[in-house]
């Protein structure tokens, strides 16, 4: 498909309605606010004793892999991560992605976008909840019965919705909601079956031991192990200690692809490229220790899942994102070269930082990289609103990567073509 298939508006609408701004300039009085869930310890303990944990498995064939596990580390500049001894060891076991980009700052919008195809102008880490008419990767996976889960280290129980859960001995920050992407969606938390798939690391260990792993999983270490409250050396060592035994586990490795990446870089004033590695049993020996220079970003996670299992799309930035090369090669998809000259960290005024702005409608007419239309249920929900927004020239791009200093119209419009939906 052409990327212009995902573009709904022209440069004029951009100039009128999509002024990019620095993250700290949004008017806090206009922020959409939500009631924070902060249960007491006794309430948490009571809920934990009554919570059921899902064990859902499936065996759906994929073009390049049968299982895809994503692990997010935290807040590290590319060069620092690339220079870490433990991460360098892991890189020798797989493929280093030298041109993989986070989307914005701070953490939470990157997590949100990785499963939802958009971060809806979120520019902080506050408590949010996306309404039930906003879909995510789970809706796509469910169309083919592809099992999925999240594994959140030290979450007190499956489906915990609280803002955080501290270490009960040291009271240090431990589990945090902002690093749990699927818990941010009402169509997950209001569905008990889905909620039971939001598990913790004890459940992960059990699922490995019992050979009950899902086919898709998002894995988040706690605030110590992911490097947020420690160092890249600490996070790198944790990553090696966590992954090295799994790389020797025949059950885990079979037909599995692992993406180890970072939510964002640390230094906001430089480009938001993050160190990333592909690992797993689907990596052929001849590619171990190699590098892939293709442009990817967090939306490539969604695009790769869609292409691997030939799924429909969400109508957001999943539809035009580059696909991981191991999947692209298996599906005859040609990735595009992306000019990263103006990839800097800017945000924009939109749904989550201005309550006067409507939710951007997904593009219900587009075709994704693997030739599939939008998910039928999304089209049914959003078709009228999409037509309305297009007729009103409502701009729906969520790019954060265009320099605010760019004034050349041709450069500006060509860059935005890649990131309009």
Curated annotation (Swiss-Prot):
Keywords: Hydrolase
Catalytic activity from the UniProt record: a phosphate monoester + H2O = an alcohol + phosphate
One Pfam family it belongs to: Phosphoesterase
Superkingdom to which the source organism belongs: Eukaryota
Gene Ontology BP annotations: phospholipid catabolic process
Keyword Transcription among UniProt keywords: no
E.C. designation(s): 3.1.3.2
Molecular functions (GO terms): acid phosphatase activity
Keyword Repressor tagged: no
Residues annotated as signal peptide: none
Record protein name field: Probable acid phosphatase
Organism: Kluyveromyces lactis (strain ATCC 8585 / CBS 2359 / DSM 70799 / NBRC 1267 / NRRL Y-1140 / WM37) (Yeast)
């Amino acid at each position: 498909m052409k990327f212009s298939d995902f573009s709904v508006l022209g440069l004029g609408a951009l100039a009128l309605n999509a002024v990019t701004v620095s993250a700290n300039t949004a008017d806090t009085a206009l922020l959409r606010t939500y009631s924070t869930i902060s249960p007491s310890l006794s309430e948490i303990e009571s809920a934990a004793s009554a919570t059921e944990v899902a064990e859902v498995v499936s065996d759906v064939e994929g073009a390049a892999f049968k299982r895809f596990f994503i692990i997010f580390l935290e807040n590290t500049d590319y060069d620092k991560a690339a220079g870490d001894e433990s991460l360098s060891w892991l890189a020798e076991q797989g493929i280093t992605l030298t041109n993989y980009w986070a989307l914005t700052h701070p953490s939470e919008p990157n997590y949100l976008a990785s499963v939802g195809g958009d971060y809806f102008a979120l520019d902080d880490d506050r408590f949010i909840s996306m309404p039930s008419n906003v879909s995510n990767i789970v809706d796509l996976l469910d169309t083919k019965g592809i099992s999925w889960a999240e594994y959140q280290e030290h979450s007190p129980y499956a489906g915990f919705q609280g803002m955080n859960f501290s270490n009960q001995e040291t009271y240090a920050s431990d589990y945090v909601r902002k690093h749990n992407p699927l818990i941010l969606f009402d169509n997950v938390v209001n569905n008990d079956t889905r909620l039971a798939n939001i598990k913790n690391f004890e459940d992960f260990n059990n699922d490995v031991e019992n050979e009950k792993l899902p086919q898709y999983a998002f894995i988040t270490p706690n605030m110590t192990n992911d490097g947020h409250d420690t160092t890249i050396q600490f996070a790198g060592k944790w990553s090696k200690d966590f992954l090295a035994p799994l790389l020797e586990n025949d059950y885990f490795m079979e037909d599995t692809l692992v993406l180890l990446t970072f939510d964002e870089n640390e230094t906001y004033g430089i480009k938001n490229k993050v160190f990333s590695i592909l690992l797993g049993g689907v990596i052929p020996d001849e590619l171990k220790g190699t590098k892939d220079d293709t442009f990817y970003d967090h939306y490539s996670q969604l695009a790769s899942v869609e292409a691997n299992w030939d799924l429909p799309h969400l109508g957001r930035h999943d539809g035009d994102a580059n696909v991981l090369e191991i999947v692209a090669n298996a599906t005859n998809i040609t990735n595009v070269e992306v000019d990263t000259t103006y990839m800097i960290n800017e945000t924009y005024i939109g749904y989550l930082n201005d309550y006067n702005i409507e939710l951007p409608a997904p593009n219900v007419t587009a075709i994704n990289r693997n030739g599939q239309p939008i998910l039928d249920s999304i089209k049914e929900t959003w078709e009228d609103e999409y037509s309305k927004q297009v007729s009103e020239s409502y701009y729906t791009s969520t790019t954060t990567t265009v320099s605010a200093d760019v004034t050349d119209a041709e450069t500006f419009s060509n860059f935005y073509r890649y990131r309009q939906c």
